[in-house]
Every structure is written in structure tokens, then in C-alpha cells.
Amino acid sequence: MSPAHALTGRPRFTYRTRLSSPAPRRLDGIDLARALAIVGMFYMHTWGHLWGDNVLRSAFEGRSSILFAVLAGVSVVLLTKSRDALTSVLQLVGRGVILVAIGLAISLDSVGPIVILVTYGFLYICVAPFVFRLNLLSAALAAATSTVALPVASFYLRRVLPDPPQFGATPTLGLVAQGEWGLFWQFLFATGLFPLLAWIPVFLTGVAAGKFLFAHEQAARWLVALGAPLFFLGYGGSWLFLRLSDFEARYSAFHPDGAEATEFLLHNAFGVTPTDWLSWLFIYVPHSGSIAELVSSTGISLFIIGLCLIACRSSVLFNDLVYPLRDLGKMPLTAYVGHILAIGYLNAHGHNIAEPGFALANLLGPIVFAMIWFRLFRRGPVEQLMYWALKPLSAVPAALRR
């Protein structure tokens, strides 16, 4: 990025760069997609709770976090495509460790179990180092296979694990301080709100998408063409399954709490599916980690990413008009951490971020801040701190070769 572009914060790059380019170029469409994920998260934590069920809540619920995770997988390709293997592994693991540390630090009681950064961090630590060198076909096969296999594995694993003291929990610093490592790992891998077994397929889908973007000129259009049918396959397949199988009536007769429990479980999940019926894996419920949810939500994520890339590349006017959102998308970690800290502060002082004034400030404040910040600096505040923390790792391979 040139100094002028770094100061203006409005670089104009195409959606595709050569594999031989010396450093990753900014992809405006990726920034826009990140911004949409951020806005979706803001909505779900504010107006989504205030207004109850509505079209926007249905559109964003569960999908914003999955879009984030797909984009995290794309970032693996951006981070490693111009680095050697050892430097890439060190950077990925280092990034993961920092994300885990930040996630634990902001997982306060006043925030509640909504912090996903620990899961993201372990994706970078445990998964990314083993998949970043896969070719496109291998990455795509890994994503497709895990989308089916890991929800099934999670289902049967959770049947033999002891029930957690609460559902929808996340790994927190409190668990670490209390030495509750068993619960920490159980929440992280299998029974928490963001279990790795459910998020690995999403992350791998992003890795495959990132490799595709740098391998094919028309990749963005193919992402749109692939994402739409995947969305309808997962969501429509779930709808069809519910009607053809008469699931609601049969499950209501089975469950001790009858139709009331069935209705609740069909619209609410806390990271995992119930383990009484395998059929839950074929039903779309936000935040359930079912096969249907993974297929549908990764599909719509690919569609959004492809559409954002096409729109930003095809129209200079559109690209300029959405630059406030693109600026927000260039500091996703800063926006996320600031949002979580705001929730914790307001909750601790008897307020709710869903109150109209706070909700509006929570949405507009980060956008205005990003617009001002990128007139002066190249990276977001937290992103710059991470860059400084990881920079020494780049010198390790050269030192080892001496």
C-alpha cells in the first residue's frame, strides 16, 4: 500500500492480486464483507434484543458470526501467501495466542457468554498451521467433509460427555483462575456457545474460498453462484425435512414438555444441537452447529463475500460511497473489542446497550471513528498493536538459518 493510500485509507485495488505480489494487497470487497458482519453483530447485540423477532433479526442471527469465521479463513490465505512456511506458522500461532489472550481478558461477567475470540484464536493455533499449505482442491474437500463429519462427531461425543453446568457458556478467564480446565476444554471443543467442532468447517470454508480467490480470475462470481444454492440447500432442505418427516408432531410426543419444548428448540440454540435425536442435525436453527445451519450459513457467507468483491470492483462510485463501511471493516478486532467493552461497562453501571441511544452510538460511533482514524493511520489501534507484537516473529526463521 502506498503512503498516500495509507493516509487516505481509501486504496483502490482490484479484488484479485497475483500470487507473486510481494505483499498482500487490501481487498475492498473483503473489508465491506467484514463491515457487514460487524454491523450484523452490533444489531444482534442491540436492536435485535430490543425489537424481538423481525426480518433483520432473522437475517443476522447466527450468520454474522459465521461470516466473520469464513472471513477469518480467507485471512489465513492473505497472511501466508507471500511468506515462507515457518514464518507463516509462527504468524498464525502467534495471532491465535493473542486472540485467545484478548478473548479471555474481555470475557467479563458483566459481558456474558458472547465472546467468540477464544474460539477464533484456537482455530488459528490448532487448525490454520495444518491447512494453509493445502491446495485448493484439498482445502475444499476438507471443508465439505468436515461440514458433515464434525457435527456428527460432536453429536455422539456430547452423548457421552457429562452435561455442562450451563448451556451456551464460553471459555473464560474465570474458569482458568478457578482451575476448571475440564469445563474450559469441554466448552471450547464441544458444548460451549462457539465449540471448535462446529466452527472448524466454517473456518476451512474460508480457507478454501481464499485460495479460490487467488487462483481464478472470476472467483468472486463463482462464490456467488455457489453460495446461493448452498444457502437454499441448507435452509430449504431443513424446511422440507420438517414437513416430510412430521418432525414437530413426533418430537412433541417424545419430549416430556411436549409442543412447548419443540417450539422453543426449533427457534433457539446455544451453540449445539440436542443429543436425543440425530434428526436435529438436519434442521436449521441459528447457533446450533447443525449440518443444515453450517451449509446454509456458509453458503450465504460465500454469496455475500463474492457479491461485495464484485460490487467494489465493478463500480468506482459504489466503492467510494461505501468507504465508511470499508474503513470499519479494516479494523474488525478494534470494533469487536470496543463493542464488547462497551457492553461490559454499560451492564456494570445498570444500563443496557440495547437502549436506543446507546444502540445508535454503538453503530455510528465505530464508523465515524474508523473514518477519522484511517485518515491518519494505516491499521486500526488493536490491529497495530497485534502487528507490533507479531513483528519479531518474522525474524525467527532468518535467525535459525544463521
Q: What label would you give each PLM region?
A:
Residues 2-402:
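Alpha-helical transmembrane segments and their immediate juxtamembrane cytosolic regions
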